[in-house]
Regions:
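Terminal low-complexity/charged segments
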Residues: 1-169
Length: 169
């Protein structure tokens, strides 16, 4: 049987909750994350781990402790009108393990919020500000969550799918 993490039998292998621990058992670097993982997916030679939004800081700390020493970026996707509406994706790299992982959290609502990971990854500062500015996602505990691209008096968040094409008037 092919190892689903390092050599999946199919280009896209998706694991349900019950199979997550089993599928990750040979992937020692991320074992510290196994109790936080809601779902795992292997696609295009990259592992994507889904965690509950309230565990994002713990997941980032566990990944860092596991050897993922480089924060590449964090980005958002608005899946409007679906719920949960927003997907926040963190990309991490381990130079020693020569591996990348993506850690994803899904958040709902018109006033979405998730904890800031700046305490673990200071490099996330401007990325979180950009997501706040363009999507309206609030990062609790962020040291300076202010607009970074749009003028301070700008109304709304232009990358939300429900943002009017003509802008607010």
């Amino acid at each position: 049987m092919a190892d689903p993490i390092t050599n999946p039998a199919t280009p896209t292998a998706v694991f349900g909750k019950q199979a997550v621990t089993e599928a990750l058992s040979d992937h020692a670097a991320i074992l510290g994350l196994k109790d936080l993982i809601v779902d795992a997916k292997w696609d295009r030679k990259e592992l994507t781990l889904t965690v509950a939004p309230e565990t994002i800081v713990a997941a980032m700390q566990a990944a860092k402790s596991a050897g993922y020493n480089f924060f590449e970026d964090v980005t958002a996707v608005d899946w409007y009108p679906s719920e949960p509406r927003f997907q926040i994706s963190y990309s991490l790299l381990s130079h020693s393990l020569k591996q990348r992982i993506r850690i994803v959290a899904h958040i709902s609502g018109d006033s979405p919020s998730i904890d800031s990971v700046t305490s673990v990854w200071p490099a996330s500062n401007f990325y979180e500000r950009e997501i706040f500015d363009l999507f309206g996602v609030h990062f609790s505990g962020h040291p300076r969550l202010t607009r970074i691209m749009m003028p301070d008096n700008w109304e709304g968040h232009p990358l939300r799918k429900d943002y009017p094409v003509e802008g607010y008037r």
